[in-house]
Amino acid sequence: MDARTHRRAAGTPRALAERAGRRCCLGWDFSTQQVKVVAVDAELNVFYEDSVHFDRDLPEFGTQGGVHVHKDRLTVTSPVLMWVQALDLILGKMKSSGFDFSQVLALSGAGQQHGSVYWKTGASLALSSLSPALPLHQQLQSCFSISDCPIWMDSSTTAQCHQLEAAVGGAQALSCLTGSRAYERFTGNQIAKLFQKNPEAYSHSERISLVSSFAASLFLGGYSPIDYSDGSGMNLLQIQEKVWSQACLDVCAPHLEEKLGSPVPSCSVVGTISSYYVQRYGFPPGCKVVAFSGDNPASLAGMRLEEGDIAVSLGTSDTLFLWLQKPMPALEGHIFCNPVDPQHYMALLCFKNGSLMREKIRDESASCSWNKFSKALKSTAMGNNGNLGFYFDVMEITPEIIGRHRFNAENMEVSAFPGDVEIRALIEGQFMAKRIHAEGLGYRVMPKTKILATGGASHNKDILQVLADVFGAPVYVIDTTSSACVGSAYRAFHGLAGGTGVAFSEVVKSAPQPSLAATPNPGASQVYAALLPRYSALEQRILSTAQRPLE
């Protein structure tokens, strides 16, 4: 026990700092619109950040929002060399600003999830023999079998999704196996489409990377493995056993396992930095590269979620990040391997009717005023005297319902509510739906549960009070402007400290704490214990009577 305690202490950022001046870890984020980097010192302070914006800084690639939307409006790609050149640019900016690369102990990063990169046969040789005299993009120009990579916004693979679900026994069976039913943007379906439409490009690909493992490969000067967490967004990885599903691979394309390589735990050190960066920029030769992961898993690390915690991003869409011990895969949401604890899981749930719906009800029922909106929440009772509402002006995805549906305390549908009742019905309904669907994936509120709120509506204390009451847990607010980057730097420290043998929470305990915004009112748990089953039953009633729109 003593030895272990000592080993943990030796690996904490502070102990690392004592051994060497202002050492740091870098966190990278290869997102849809930009490449961003932060440097985090051993006290876990961010002391440097920079970015390259694709549309603005690399206009020659002709992207809008970092992407090309094709004529069919379904196919969406990004040029792989744009990502490579962005890395050249950002490292050049860091060098000219005097950034001291010699102090970098380790780096990790994040990539937009699901996107895929196809390395041409012979590319590994080019990667391993880079000349420090030239930028990357000049040396890697002929290394890719397709120049435009499918990304998460692509929805052109419906046929391949049907094929995959049919082959493994249906959508629920695929979800139990891989954590999600078949989604058009998921990598396995994109690979299947490439194999079917362009078998030559597929056969000329010696390695297929995710955006995350592609970026890590650039730093390694060799192919980086895919990590378990980002690998969970492919419809290919068995999330329980953490191996590729042979059944899924066989449906998608031949020889796929050798093109993907073996997946690794997300906190693995995958190697040391390529000599290219040592000679061109002055990185230390011992600088470690920790497996890159997806942007959502990296954000979970950046928000420092722990077991039982939940993060609620209240934006245009509302997104839930859950930490799960025992996942129950469903037809909705996504379950991934947890990026900071390989024994556990994380889940993502997306709700389309987010801030725009809140703003609409504010305009209709509170004369366009957030103050009046807040006043309505304060002047109405928890539980809204049994009045419940569903507000889906656009087709919701969790669950698939459209329209507004209001019910009184007797479960009778009514056509309208008074303004203040409408406002509380909206906010209570949005948060009850989140709790019900989270619990549907295996989430349970625990005594130590914290809720981390981010996004626009997290600035409204009265909305957060309802969130605390519905979940029966304290709500904290946290700044997440660079959470994927910062989370990647934290993950680099974690990998450096020993990865799986060390608790992530131990490594990041000195990071800035979130601030408490709301605690549940007395009696809240009794009120919502009665309302939640009613809300769930009414949701089922609406679902069963809803006419599915014609597709």
Curated annotation (Swiss-Prot):
Keyword annotations for this protein, in alphabetical order, are: ATP-binding, Carbohydrate metabolism, Kinase, Nucleotide-binding, Transferase, Xylose metabolism
| Residue positions binding substrate | 114, 185, 295-296
Annotated positions binding ATP: 370, 456-457, 460
Per its record, what are the GO molecular function terms?
Answer: ATP binding; D-xylulokinase activity
- Set out the biological process GO terms recorded for this chain's protein: D-glucuronate catabolic process to D-xylulose 5-phosphate; D-xylose metabolic process; xylulose metabolic process
* Transmembrane segments annotated in the record for this chain: none
Q: Which Pfam families match?
A: FGGY_C (PF02782), FGGY_N (PF00370)
**Coiled-coil region:** none
SUPFAM superfamilies in the record: Actin-like ATPase domain
What catalytic reaction does the record list? D-xylulose + ATP = D-xylulose 5-phosphate + ADP + H(+)
Q: What is its EC number?
A: 2.7.1.17
Similarity remark: Belongs to the FGGY kinase family.
PANTHER family given in the database record: SUGAR KINASE, XYLULOSE KINASE
Function text: Phosphorylates D-xylulose to produce D-xylulose 5-phosphate, a molecule that may play an important role in the regulation of glucose metabolism and lipogenesis.
How does the annotation summarize its subunit structure? Monomer.
Record protein name field? Xylulose kinase
Species, as recorded: Mus musculus (Mouse)
